[in-house]
């Protein structure tokens, strides 16, 4: 068979299995360009600031169609690896000016990992006014609005903001590679990380570009999004305040409808699970106001194409991970160092089982024979403050002065029951629900930033009793199938 015929067949197969996300990301865009706007010399690294124009999106319906980003590149002295780390971040289009310094996160990763490290900002570009409605939309308000536009007319997938957000990451990689050639550095491949909406973008970037060899999605355990989102109502009897932008746009009126299935086919990373053939280090928070601590149950075991996957639940942390940033950064640094030096990463499996009456649960963590034994293993446990809601959130409403729950996750060291096997069984509390998970910590060489490099992986979360206090959102008219219009309420009648 000729090479030309093989290429044609491969192209045909790719087109058959492509989605609107693939099509948008791969579409040529003459808007793309970059310029070097600043060079900053430091003793241990050189910083470069690029102004990147990634694309034009929704030109006829947006007041900000041309997307621009600041790209900060940290090149450590004597860099030897050709793997580049990119952290996808947010930002605002307002007060557009050249950054005068490197982002601290990028600097830490750069110096601690020894790799070229990049900060990509303005994902998404914001604020944006759509359809001349005069409303400046940021973050979830922006994303929810674009969802609602698509749900109302699924023939227009370009409305979905996740498409340009993902393409911006791809164009950032293009710019970094092109710029690297001007300074004698070759970025062959990339590790991508990002949090929240940028975490979702990290998931999707990993499936559209083969240059990405590992991803670190942070506080975005959204995969299998339809049942994952619906699970929240079973636990709370209402939608979390964190979803106000989505309920306000009437998105939940489509949760069980064919339109949401079409949306998920484009933007739900679960739809692309067979493409996750690279290492994944997924980081989530125990008290997230967007997600539940057991959200990974909806997708983790289904990532069967992934050769290496690691989960970390951060205890006593809400969605912003306030107070935990340095610990998380250093854990990511260790993961990146092990990747770029081709060293083995720790692995283990876990199994969660419940008693017949669902009132007690057991987690067994097993290190494979010959595997790396953790420095220590802890069990983290917490009990809900509410006795009617299975609710582990720290913050339960927009006004945090009125709705703080004192959910405290307590650690206890546990010893192995045999070599590399750790087991814990806990029972339900006198009232409410108890959640628990196992955390394995690994210790590596010292560095100039911290005493040691630490790497933390965890099991999923078990909750006892293994029961949910409410029915589905549809039972309470809090979601719909897309046929009744924007009419659903947001709260169960208690």
Swiss-Prot record:
It is found in: Secreted. GO terms for molecular function: chemorepellent activity; peptidase activity; signaling receptor binding. Residues 1-18 form the signal peptide. It holds the Pfam family PhoPQ_related. Glycans are attached at residues 37, 153, 302. Disruption phenotype: Cells proliferate more rapidly than wild type cells and exhibit supernumerary centrosomes and a cytokinesis defect. They also produce fewer spores at culmination. GO terms for biological process: negative chemotaxis; negative regulation of aggregate size involved in sorocarp development; negative regulation of asexual reproduction; negative regulation of Ras protein signal transduction; protein localization to plasma membrane; sporulation resulting in formation of a cellular spore. InterPro entries: AB_hydrolase_fold, PhoPQ-act_pathogen-rel_PqaA. Keywords: Cell cycle, Glycoprotein, Secreted, Signal. Its main location: secreted. The keyword Cell inner membrane does not apply. GO terms for cellular component: extracellular region; protein-containing complex. Induction: Up-regulated by phagocytic stimuli. It comes from the Eukaryota. Inhibitor that slows proliferation of secreting cells (also known as chalone). May function by binding to cell surface receptors. Requires cfaD for activity. Overexpression slows proliferation. Belongs to the pqaA family. Interacts with cfaD. This is Autocrine proliferation repressor protein A.
């Amino acid at each position: 068979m000729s090479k030309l015929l093989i290429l044609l067949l491969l192209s045909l197969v790719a087109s058959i299995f492509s989605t609107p996300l693939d099509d948008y990301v791969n579409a040529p865009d003459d808007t793309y360009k970059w310029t070097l706007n600043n060079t900053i010399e430091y003793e241990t690294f050189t910083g470069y600031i690029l102004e990147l124009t990634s694309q034009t999106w929704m030109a006829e319906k947006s007041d900000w169609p041309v997307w621009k980003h600041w790209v900060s590149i940290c090149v450590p002295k004597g860099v030897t690896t050709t793997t580049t780390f990119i952290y996808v971040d947010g930002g605002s289009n307002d007060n557009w000016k050249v950054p005068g310094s490197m982002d601290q996160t990028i600097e830490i990763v750069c110096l601690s990992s020894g790799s070229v490290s990049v900060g990509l900002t303005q994902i998404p570009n914001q604020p944006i006014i759509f359809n001349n409605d005069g409303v400046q939309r940021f973050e979830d308000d922006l994303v929810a609005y674009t969802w609602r536009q698509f749900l109302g007319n699924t023939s227009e997938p370009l409305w979905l903001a996740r498409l340009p957000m993902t393409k911006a990451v791809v164009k950032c990689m293009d710019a970094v590679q092109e710029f690297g050639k001007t300074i004698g550095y070759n970025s062959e491949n990339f590790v991508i990380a990002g949090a929240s909406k940028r975490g979702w973008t990290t998931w999707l970037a990993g499936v559209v570009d083969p240059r990405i060899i590992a991803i670190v999605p942070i506080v975005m355990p959204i995969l299998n999004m339809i049942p994952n989102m619906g699970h929240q109502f079973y636990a709370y009897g209402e939608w979390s305040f964190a979803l106000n932008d989505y309920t306000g746009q009437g998105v939940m009126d489509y949760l069980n409808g064919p339109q949401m299935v079409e949306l998920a086919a484009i933007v739900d990373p679960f739809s692309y699970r067979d493409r996750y053939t690279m290492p994944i280090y997924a980081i989530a928070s125990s008290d997230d106001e967007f997600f539940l601590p057991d959200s990974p149950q909806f997708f983790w075991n289904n990532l069967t194409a992934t050769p290496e996957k690691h989960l970390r639940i951060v205890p006593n942390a809400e969605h912003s991970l306030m107070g935990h940033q340095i610990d998380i950064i250093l854990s990511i640094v260790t993961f990146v160092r092990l990747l770029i030096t081709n060293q083995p990463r720790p692995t283990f499996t876990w199994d969660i089982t419940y008693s017949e009456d669902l009132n007690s649960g057991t987690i067994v963590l097993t290190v494979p024979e010959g595997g790396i034994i953790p420095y220590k293993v802890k069990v983290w446990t917490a009990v809900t403050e509410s006795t009617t809601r299975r609710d582990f959130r720290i913050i339960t409403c927009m006004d945090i002065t009125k709705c703080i729950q004192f959910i405290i996750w307590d650690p206890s060291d546990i010893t192995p029951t045999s070599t590399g096997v750790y087991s814990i069984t806990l029972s339900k509390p006198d009232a409410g629900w108890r959640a628990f998970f196992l955390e394995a910590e690994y210790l590596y060489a010292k560095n100039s930033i911290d005493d040691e490099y630490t790497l933390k992986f965890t099991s999923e979360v078990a909750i006892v009793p293994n029961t949910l206090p409410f029915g589905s959102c549809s039972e309470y008219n809090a979601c719909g199938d897309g046929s009744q219009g924007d009419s659903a309420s947001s709260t169960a009648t208690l």
